[in-house]
């Protein structure tokens, strides 16, 4: 579907700036939707722009709808799809957020620090302060384990194979912390800025560390983890804050 972006843009009388905006929006759209358009994927895209400003959301919806109509006209699509402002991702009463497609988080990017921060939250359910406190000595990539030491205690967390290359890249030259400058950990604002820049670059502007952590919770629950097991993984004193995800 990406191959039709340029012919579509060429078919419209657009200024150079407008062409760049259309191209940027459509590349993100195609990245999330993929090659086969269906209602579920469109809802996924709708969810990804839900936290944008009203003007940005309207622009992206308009661009995507024009592109969808173009694809229908040239018979790439057998059915005509249209995104609307009122479309919402289906949610259950017990789950107040939808699981998003995170494939794009693992793709090559110039914003490698923000990417690794987001992946550590998505993969391990860490808080920003826990990410900031990761020490080089407590990362064992051979055995794929992270020993996390906090005021609440010590947790040993498994590292997925997909996470290892991202960690290897950032460990080079580090003295004490995974995220540091000459042995001094970066500030809380530094983490916030780098995470914000990365998620914005992949079309998830407004996706906070808290929302990323919620994605971890939803996926672990879906994988069959009990509320007690998940509470232990997250290092919580009690599972009370997780109850809303487990209510029937």
Swiss-Prot record:
InterPro entries: CB (IPR044068), DNA_brk_join_enz (IPR011010), Integrase-like_cat_sf (IPR013762), Integrase_catalytic (IPR002104), Integrase_recombinase_N (IPR010998), Tyrosine_recombinase_XerD-like (IPR020876). The active site is at residues 149, 213, 245. One of its GO terms (molecular function) is tyrosine-based site-specific recombinase activity. Residues 1-72 form the Core-binding (CB) domain. Keywords: Cytoplasm, DNA integration, DNA recombination, DNA-binding. Residues 85-248 form the Tyr recombinase domain. Its main location: cytoplasm. It is found in: Cytoplasm. GO terms for biological process: DNA transposition. One of its GO terms (cellular component) is cytoplasm. CDD domains: INT_StrepXerD_C_like (cd01190). The keyword DNA-binding applies. Putative tyrosine recombinase. Not involved in the cutting and rejoining of the recombining DNA molecules on dif(SL) site. Belongs to the 'phage' integrase family. XerD-like subfamily. This is Tyrosine recombinase XerD-like. The lineage of its organism: Bacteria, Bacillati, Bacillota, Bacilli, Lactobacillales.
């Amino acid at each position: 579907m990406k191959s039709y972006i340029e012919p579509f843009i060429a078919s419209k009388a657009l200024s150079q700036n407008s062409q760049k905006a259309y191209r940027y929006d459509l590349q993100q759209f195609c990245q999330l939707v993929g090659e086969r358009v269906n209602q579920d994927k469109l809802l996924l895209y709708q969810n990804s722009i839900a936290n944008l400003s009203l003007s940005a959301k309207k622009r992206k919806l308009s661009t995507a709808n024009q592109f969808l109509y173009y694809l229908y006209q040239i018979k790439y699509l057998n059915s005509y799809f249209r995104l609307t402002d009122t479309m919402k991702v289906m949610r259950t009463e017990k789950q107040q957020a939808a699981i998003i497609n995170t494939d794009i988080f693992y793709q090559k990017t110039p914003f490698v620090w923000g990417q690794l921060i987001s992946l550590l939250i998505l993969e391990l359910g860490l808080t920003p302060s826990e990410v900031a406190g990761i020490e080089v000595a407590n990362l064992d990539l051979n055995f794929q384990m992270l020993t996390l030491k906090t005021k609440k205690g010590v947790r040993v967390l498994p590292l997925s194979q997909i996470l290892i290359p991202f960690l290897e890249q950032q460990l080079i030259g580090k003295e004490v912390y995974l995220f540091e400058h000459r042995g001094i950990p970066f500030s809380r604002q530094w983490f916030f800025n780098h995470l914000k820049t990365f998620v914005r670059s992949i079309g998830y502007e407004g996706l906070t560390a808290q929302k990323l952590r919620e994605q971890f919770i939803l996926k672990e629950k879906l994988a069959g983890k009990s509320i007690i097991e998940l509470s232990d993984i997250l290092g919580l004193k009690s599972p009370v804050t997780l109850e809303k995800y487990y209510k029937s």
